[in-house]
Amino acid sequence: GGSAFNVIPDQVTIGGTLRSTNKDTRNDMLKKIKNAAQGACSINNCSVNIEVRPGYPSTINDKKSAKFASTVFENSFGINSLNKEEKPTMTSEDFSYMLQEKPGAYIWLGAGEKSEKLHSAHYDFNDELLPIGAEYWASLAEKILE
């Protein structure tokens, strides 16, 4: 950008994150972004350099593993303690590489309704969750070994 909002800069850098649950959709969106940028440049007598840094693959749970994980949680803490959100959350997570190799489920242990979001500068981990998380992971291990 420029030195002030009303000064046209010599150079502009635009960044962003592109996420989807489908590789083909992601590639199509990237192609459309490139076409739009190149089209805007062609009518404004400027050039564009598009740099794509591949990120993590989509984090997609195995349905059987997700069901197993939720059943263990329900049995440990009750059905009202569980939010079975089924729509994608677009989580960018290195665990996605593990899910490409072995079936599994990425789970979230909520911090409570009054918590700041995880990546907020004001986030404060709720230490009272430690025993709940430990009990859950122990229950998962016990059930998988049965």
Located regions from the model:
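Metal-dependent amide/peptide-bond hydrolase catalytic core
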Residues: 1-146
